[in-house]
Amino acid sequence: MTQNEPTAPEDASLDELRAEIEDIDREIVELIARRTYVADSVAQVKDERDLPTTDEGQEDRVMERAGRNAEHFDVDSNLVKAVFRLLIELN
C-alpha cells in the first residue's frame, strides 16, 4: 500500500485508521501553510504594483474551481467552498 492509498476498513485496525487520519491532517496543515505563503507573496506583489488587495473575479474563479474539485472527488461542495472562503478571508 502506498502512502496516499486509503486503507480498506477490513484490513486495518482502529489505531491504523486513526494514524492514517493523523497523517492526512498533517498533510492538510502543510498545504494550508504552503497556500498561505504563496498568498502572502501575491499580496506583496500587489502592494509593489499598487494593485487592489482584493480581486473579486479571482475569488470567484477560486470558488468555482473549489466546487468543481469537490464534485470530482465526491465531496460536499458547500463544505469545500466554506473552507476556501475561510482561506481567502485569512489572506
Model-derived features: where do they sit?
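Domain-level signature for soluble enzymes in the chorismate/prephenate branch of the shikimate pathway
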Residues: M1-N91
